[in-house]
Amino acid sequence: MSVDLDITGGVARVTINRPERMNAVDLATAARLEAIWQQIEGDPSVRCVVLSGAGEKAFSAGADMKSGDKAKSGVQYWADGNPMGFGGITFRDTLKVPVIARVNGFALGGGMEMVLGADIVIAADHARFGLTEARVGRLPLDGGMVLLQRLIPRNIAAGMMLTGRMVPAAEMARYGLINAVVPAPELDAEVDRWIADITACAPLSLRAIKAMMRRTAQMSAREAAGARLPELIEALNSEDQHEGVAAFNEKRAPVWKGR
């Protein structure tokens, strides 16, 4: 399989497994990713997703330009559109659980666009990030051009895209894109710490928070505060919101049911 999926203990680990191609995404890999996202969306046991690339060199180098797939022209690719973004994740608003990008190396082009679709980014200190499309005569069409400038200072985003430069993880952390940068041997332990904290929270609360953040980002604060999203109402009416208060008062760990 070009992408591996393991679901254990409520955590779905999605690993692009093409290390010989720097985990670049060809048509078959893109189709496999889409099938995986749909499977996860239909599995209520999943509480968190970890997206990574196999090996130690690359998270993903983006589109596989040597795959042998019938190539589209740039304008054909743009005209066809990709509503979910690169790898089916950049713009995906139907995946309601937190997504961690475990960045174990280069995240370039579409690989970086997948990072932009994550909720939390954990990177090894040797990781490098870049929207390098202009260096091969293409554009960051699957989310890079519109999202990067919303997530880091505009002039920094412009500098990256207008030069195609690759930026070290520590620098991207200073710009606010990365939650944690750790030495490579500590990457999995750091990811596990984030998973533990996420799964300690009520699942419906996290779904509501993610939905509110995603869907109200372009609203005024007053408009956003007044949004009545279904996920918000579900969380506020859930058994878990009673369980959380009871557990706090009884000085015990809550037992979440996700309902």
What are these regions (language model features)?
Residues 1-56:
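Conserved CoA-thioester-binding segment of acyl-CoA-metabolizing enzymes
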